């Protein structure tokens, strides 16, 4: 505006836009919050302009869609004052997500956190990403969120979700990247393990280096490795840890679909791949009890020719330090 231009020309320091200024302004927002396209058609880097009145924007081509400001916090972002906005973007149907938007003194959108492409990283089965707490430290965010559907929860939109999380995010110039996430589950606090650490366990099992592998597994699994696997003429080691096995992805075990006619449910990974699990049953290979909220599933690949489904996987007990504690393989364990 002219007033802003004159103030800056006279040497007044930059200041972050106030909540009142933002709540009644035309602003750039992430495309998924722009009221024009469905969330599935929008891109993470896409942008739209909307007009807020008393903190809410509506009236786009997406019927009943609206974007509502929930909170405004000031900070210094990349050397300049900035306002960090927590907003809920409701897509016009049953779903909506909380977004983070950062505006500089000129009310230009300079950064945003779009949770939609990263929901698996943020907790797996999340219908609506709901931020319950926001803290800002320069270009870093600390968020708390809930509404995470964990194993044992019912798997439909309106069901009660038992999981929540806290996470730190750092701006890398393109997006806010999660640097540490702690999930709060029925099993206690859980961090996902590093894939390299899980791979070390798999490599040790394949190499018959059981003394090394034992540091990452329960004793009952180690003693079962050279027993015959169910429905197989091979051992557990041969069936579930063949040479060349690589860890594809590890996820917090989510709420699962209803069982099919064979009693199997599908688990979805963030990379679009799937695995089968017999929900609710105790392991048949290692008697460590049934799967639990807070468990971690790691999908294994047998070769470079990946299909859309992990043929084998291993289940870990979640640990607060992200340590590896494997207790059973699958799907033969079902």
Regions found by a protein language model. Name each.
Residues 1-73:
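Terminal domain-start segments
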Residues 90-94:
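Extended, low-complexity, turn-rich repeat/linker tracts enriched in Gly/Pro/Ser/Thr and Asp/Glu
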Residues 76-88, 137-146:
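Acidic/hydrophobic-patterned starts of short beta strands in beta-sheet-rich repeat architectures
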Residues 95-114, 169-173:
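Beta-propeller blade repeat segments, especially FG-GAP/WD-type strand-to-loop junctions
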Residues 73, 86-89, 101-102:
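Predominantly extracellular/secreted and cell-surface proteins with exposed
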Residues 110-120, 178-183:
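Beta-propeller fold detector
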Residues 61-69, 119-128:
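Repeat-based blade/solenoid architectures
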Residues 11-42, 124, 129-334:
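Acidic, small-residue rich beta-repeat scaffolds with periodic aromatic anchors
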């Amino acid at each position: 505006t002219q007033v802003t231009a004159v103030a800056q020309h006279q040497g007044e320091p930059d200041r972050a836009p106030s909540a009142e200024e933002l709540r009644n302004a035309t602003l750039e927002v992430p495309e998924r919050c722009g009221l024009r396209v469905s969330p599935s058609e929008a891109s993470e880097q896409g942008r739209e302009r909307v007009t807020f009145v008393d903190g809410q924007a509506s009236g786009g081509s997406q019927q009943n869609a609206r974007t509502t400001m929930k909170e405004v916090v000031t900070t210094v972002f990349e050397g300049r004052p900035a306002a960090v906005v927590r907003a809920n973007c409701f897509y016009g149907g049953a779903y909506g997500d909380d977004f983070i938007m950062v505006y500089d003194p000129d009310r230009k959108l300079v950064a945003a956190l779009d949770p939609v492409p990263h929901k698996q990283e943020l907790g797996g089965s999340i219908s609506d990403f709901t931020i319950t707490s926001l803290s800002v430290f320069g270009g870093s965010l600390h968020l708390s969120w809930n509404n995470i559907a964990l194993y044992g929860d019912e798997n439909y939109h309106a069901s009660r979700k038992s999981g929540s999380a806290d996470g730190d995010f750092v701006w890398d110039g393109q997006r806010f990247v999660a640097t540490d996430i702690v999930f709060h589950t029925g099993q206690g606090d859980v961090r996902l393990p590093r894939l390299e650490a899980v791979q070390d366990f798999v490599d040790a099992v394949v190499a018959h280096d059981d003394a090394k592998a034992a540091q990452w597994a329960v004793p009952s699994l180690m003693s079962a490795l050279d027993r015959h696997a169910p429905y197989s003429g091979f051992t557990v080691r041969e069936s579930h840890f063949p040479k060349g096995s690589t860890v594809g992805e590890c996820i917090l075990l989510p709420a699962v679909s209803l069982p099919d006619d064979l009693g199997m449910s599908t688990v979805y990974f963030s990379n679009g791949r799937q695995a089968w699990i017999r929900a609710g049953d105790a392991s048949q290979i290692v008697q460590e009890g049934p799967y639990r909220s807070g468990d971690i599933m790691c999908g294994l690949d047998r070769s470079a020719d990946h299909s859309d489904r992990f043929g084998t996987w291993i289940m870990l007990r979640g640990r607060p330090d992200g340590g590896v504690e494997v207790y059973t393989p699958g799907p033969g364990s079902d």
